[in-house]
Amino acid sequence: VINVAGHRLGTREIEEAVSSHPAVAEAAVIGVADELKGQVPVVFATLRQTAADAAAQQATAAEMMHTVADQLGAVARPARVYVVTALPKTRSGKLLRRSLQALAEARDPGDLSTLDDPNALEDVRRVLERGADAG
């Protein structure tokens, strides 16, 4: 649960809205600290097929943002959507949301001993450094 401008939002509901987009294979939503709103939702998503180019990827990310706003309201609209090749997971398949949040807030991701694929976390780092977002 994240608190966006006094509204308590479930990350699962936002993930389900993003996942309803036909291009999305998998999504993770985290709350990132924001001076004005307290927290804002940020989406990390993998696509079913690789986008043709950066413009197509940004268009898909913008569509995801609109899908969330249409289904859950403007308050749930993600501040950013990052398209990554894979989401960081444990060996048992659980998403490492705390690591995603730490990287998004430029903090140390902490203990990564359970990380299944280190390349997934490195991809997230690269995407965050490039600022490849849709808004």
What is each of the regions a protein language model found here?
Residues V1-A76, T85-A86, G93-L95, S99-A102, ...:
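AMP-binding/adenylate-forming catalytic core of the ANL superfamily
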Residues D123-G135:
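A cross-kingdom feature marking charged/low-complexity
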